[in-house]
A protein has these predicted regions:
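ATP-dependent kinase catalytic cores of phosphoinositide-metabolizing enzymes
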Residues: 2-133
Length: 133
């Protein structure tokens, strides 16, 4: 989706709650989140060696993750309240547990950030699969 300001945004509760698409029993989405080389091309302003811009983007992602994590209990409570709302992506406590695991609420901030960085690297490394999807 595109705002009037030109900013892109997309809300997909399915992804943040661990509901990934499959077809004929094959998991179509195999990365923690979508981070294509096309996105990276735009972030780097079309320059292949512009690691400064990409570094800034990555730092913003890490900062945003930690902010979300700090408010994790609020998110868990709000999603728990929505269990009966009829959202197809939010039907069981298992969906909420996926969110807890993603935010690494049982871990220290350092461990949680390490987990996020690993997921970020995996999304980047396996981004070719999103083109196949």
């Amino acid at each position: 989706m595109v705002k009037k300001t030109g900013q892109l945004f997309h809300i997909d509760f399915g992804h943040i709650l661990g509901n990934f698409k499959s077809k004929f029993g094959i998991k179509r989405e195999r990365v923690p989140f979508i981070l294509t080389y096309d996105f990276i091309h735009v972030i780097q302003q079309g320059k292949t060696g512009n690691t400064e811009k990409f570094g800034q983007f990555r730092q913003c992602c890490e900062d945003a993750y930690l902010i979300l994590r700090r408010h994790g209990n609020l998110f868990i409570t709000l999603f728990a309240l929505m269990l009966t709302a009829g959202l197809p992506e939010l039907t069981s406590v298992k969906d909420i547990q996926y969110l807890k695991d993603s935010l690494a609420l049982g871990k220290s901030e350092e461990e949680a950030l390490k987990q996020f960085k690993q997921k970020f690297d995996e999304a980047l490394r396996e981004s070719w699969t999103t083109k196949v999807n």
